[in-house]
Amino acid sequence: MSDLAVERFVTFVVVIVHPDPSEVTIVNAGHMPPVWLRSADNTIVEPGQQESGLPIAIDSGMRYESVRCTIEPGDVMVLYTDGVNEAMNGNDEEFGMDRIRQLTAAGGDAQTITDRLVTAVRTFVSDTPPFDDMALVVIQRI
């Protein structure tokens, strides 16, 4: 076990896109899994959630599992930092992962989903100052 303070741990998710044969490999180190909108049936899946390991620097012997998934035309994947799902409003409520899932499930292309999420977070927090950085990456197979 590391002697680092809890706030010093780092989580991450790595998504490697393999254009041929249209697959992604996901490795998760204690991070929120990608929110993936499957275009074939409009379902939300979160690959890498079961395979998530500990944040880095907690256990120097930690071995991380990868998961490989096929990405179909029209599929959209949302990756985000905890500053997005943990964004707080004036009532001390978190934006939450459920909102991210719901807003992604509403569909659209990568730009539409990006715009929807950014607008929703900005509206939710209103004039409450952010306590953490926020990053959002939305990718789509065309």
Regions found by a protein language model. Name each.
Residues 1-142:
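Conserved subregion of the PPM/PP2C metallophosphatase catalytic domain
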